[in-house]
């Protein structure tokens, strides 16, 4: 089900009901770009601590925006054993351009090309995107609205409002007190802006909104004062309603937060960063503060990438490269619990995905996330209970077996493989760091070293000294392969990095200690009395 700005407000009550009744919610987000082309030191690498990775990625999140959010609400069907219905919705979003708010964001050509390849409709994003704002933006616009201190930022709106003001001013010159005129075809945000600007500019008029037109009435100044302070003028309620419309998807985001349902994604770290930045607050500089904020918003996070990694190793499933392939393996006869697993059906208004595969459409991927979660949880449950597996498992039992994976979110290309949102991060389990010593290759660069090894395996490279480089990979077999391949190389010497042996600081300290010890020994020998 696709939801744009035209349908969003009418859909809110149903959406709230679906979230409240869900056992969990699947999530996927599509962006206008993933990572900005930063200079090499600012690019993420396997050398990064989680806090370093976060600060580098934060810049990209601030540069790009969300074009589509997919949510799939999974609810167990009452009276039916281990059966779930999925309500999957695509939300097309576009940043609020209202009053003082006017966002800037970038497009990345590769991301646009990728989504276009999978049929993404950019017209729905640009023309009918649901507005949204974070709490900081909401405070600014609320302050501006409620105080009546209004500025129009959009050049298009400025031109339209100038025409309206000129029209009303010409009418006022000939109008008598009590006369009124109608401005047709004005509704929504524009109607609000027109009324605020007219009331600010002209002290002898009053405005009333009627469906899709604004009525302007000429009044005396005492009458204007009375209308502004009269209880019958529901301006405050009207302003609150307009603010609600301007908040758009952020209203539903708060409903999602309030519901506190488990949130399920696949490689969901970027999704969480954007949720924080776009709907909650600008991303803080502190990595720990970011973790605390996300945990308070969504106390139960499950990343299916993290869950399936372990299962794939243990059951020796075929290698997969994307979420759809994960889903297909778990839905095939390779899964020993395929026939006893949960039954998942699509809601009546969401039948599209029952017949069509739509990879990289946000709602479809959100549905895949939820389905993979249920299938993997059932597999884990059977392994725990063996042949005496629970006959009619309920979702809380699935959550119990998933407990080791809760709030463990996969991290792509960093010093640790995952982030723990409910406590300290776990130590790295990456392969050991290798050190490359270069002989007879003056002026060699990190890029040249990278190209030297890229045909054998992929390493992140960091200069250590003028003739030494640190190499790091995320695969143990690659580290072993390079150590073996370059064991007797004439110009490139590769070995395991040992801090006590290779660290310049420790080497310097050992040299100083050696010198001090030598001089102490000499002094001792020279100071001994001759026999």
Curated annotation (Swiss-Prot):
Q: Name the reaction it catalyses.
A: Exonucleolytic cleavage of poly(A) to 5'-AMP
Cellular compartments annotated: Endoplasmic reticulum membrane
- A GO MF term: RNA binding
UniProt entry keywords in alphabetical sequence: Endoplasmic reticulum, Exonuclease, Hydrolase, Magnesium, Membrane, Metal-binding, Nonsense-mediated mRNA decay, Nuclease, RNA-binding, Transmembrane, Transmembrane helix
What induces the gene encoding this protein? Answer: Down-regulated in differentiated cells, due to methylation of its promoter by the methyltransferase DNMT3B.
- Cofactor(s) recorded in Swiss-Prot or TrEMBL: Mg(2+)
Enzyme category, top tier: hydrolase
How does the entry describe its membrane topology?
A: Single-pass membrane protein
| Major place of residence | endoplasmic reticulum
GO CC terms, sorted: endoplasmic reticulum; endoplasmic reticulum membrane
State the Gene3D superfamilies in the record.
Answer: Ribonuclease H-like superfamily/Ribonuclease H
Instruction: Tell me yes or no: is Ribosomal protein among this UniProt entry's keywords.
Output: no
Tissue/organ expression? Specifically expressed in embryonic stem cells. Highly expressed in testis.
Write the Enzyme Commission number(s) for this entry.
3.1.13.4
Chain positions recorded as Mg(2+) binding sites:
28, 30, 271, 365
Query: Which GO BP terms apply?
Result: blastocyst formation; nuclear-transcribed mRNA catabolic process, nonsense-mediated decay; nuclear-transcribed mRNA poly(A) tail shortening; piRNA processing; spermatogenesis
- Origin, by domain of life? Eukaryota
The record's InterPro entries line, in alphabetical order, gives: CAF1_poly(A)_ribonucleases, RNase_CAF1, RNaseH-like_sf, RNaseH_sf
Q: What does this protein do?
A: 3'-exoribonuclease that has a preference for poly(A) tails of mRNAs, thereby efficiently degrading poly(A) tails. Exonucleolytic degradation of the poly(A) tail is often the first step in the decay of eukaryotic mRNAs and is also used to silence certain maternal mRNAs translationally during oocyte maturation and early embryonic development. May act as a regulator of multipotency in embryonic stem cells. Is a critical factor for proper spermatogenesis, involved in pre-piRNAs processing to generate mature piRNAs.
The family line of this record is: Belongs to the CAF1 family.
The name of this protein is: Poly(A)-specific ribonuclease PNLDC1
Organism this protein belongs to = Mus musculus
Taxonomic lineage is:
Eukaryota, Metazoa, Chordata, Craniata, Vertebrata
